[in-house]
Amino acid sequence: MSFTRQEPPRPVIAVVGPTGSGKSDLGVNLALALDGEVINADALQFYRGMDIGTAKITVEERRGVPHHLLDSMDVTQEASVADFQDECRAAINDIHSRGKRAILVGGSGLYVRAALDVLEFPGTDPTLRKELEEECENNGLAPLRARLEEVDPVSAARLGDARRVIRALEVHGLTGRPFSSFMPQREYFQPALQIGLEVDREQLRERLAVRVHRMVEGGLQQEVERLDAVGLRSGKTASRALGYAQFLKVLDGEMTADTAAEETIVATRQFARRQLTWFRADPRITWLGWQDPELVDKAVKVVNAAST
């Protein structure tokens, strides 16, 4: 009897790191080198029309590489990590079924974890949530926090604001399980590898400032005006995006464009620091220098080593 040797499944490749570090370019270069396709894991790049303010990769910059989950939502829609998980894993399966490499690119840490790791998303109970919100409004947060300490002390110690405490109690009421039991574990859902872009923090700070000024010069305010006309303000996710929230205030006469630009720079730098903290906590990531002239070659070697 003869047996056919089965090839091990190809790992999903994830390119991660802070905003402005060059993830999109590396993703395209890896796709060209490895016969792959890119899946977007930047929550704000899901939105059609949010191009300048998200530094969305252009059609020309994609260099013929197929990109999935870009421009897949209207600005009025709310982004959902659970929905993304389903859509991303479907895209991964589709890409792999055609013999291609799936390359996940993005800096939205929870979205990357949702795609790669074993991670459950509990449902919602609008009626229970409304009851909890009314209780919080009438009696304050303290009684709800005390209740959470009884059923889920881990979450009670970690969650500070009313919205998250209410969500934790909602999940417990819905599932009978503590909210903390749904937190992501560092266990891959399927074979995967992560490549992180190591940055010089001072250089990144300067790059982010230059990038925001270029966005403004490139028409960010006009982009916000166009999106405002199609419902940007009603979108819970899109309306809070860096740059967009600030320039909505410009449209309302609450601040000048110069002030909006400076506030966007500060907020973007803070966001980049949070991204670095998130990704640095994951020991599975292989870090490569963002400005290394041999970056692509080294990244390909990391992938090939993990695939043998």
UniProtKB/Swiss-Prot annotation:
The record marks 108, 129 as: Interaction with substrate tRNA. It is an enzyme of class 2 (transferase). It catalyses: adenosine(37) in tRNA + dimethylallyl diphosphate = N(6)-dimethylallyladenosine(37) in tRNA + diphosphate. Substrate binds at residues 19-24. GO terms for biological process: tRNA modification. Its cofactor is Mg(2+). Keywords: ATP-binding, Magnesium, Nucleotide-binding, Transferase, tRNA processing. ATP binds at residues 17-24. One of its GO terms (molecular function) is tRNA dimethylallyltransferase activity. Its EC number is 2.5.1.75. The keyword Cell wall biogenesis/degradation does not apply. Pfam families: IPPT. SUPFAM superfamilies: P-loop containing nucleoside triphosphate hydrolases (SSF52540). HAMAP family: IPP_trans (MF_00185). Monomer. Belongs to the IPP transferase family. Catalyzes the transfer of a dimethylallyl group onto the adenine at position 37 in tRNAs that read codons beginning with uridine, leading to the formation of N6-(dimethylallyl)adenosine (i(6)A). This is tRNA dimethylallyltransferase.
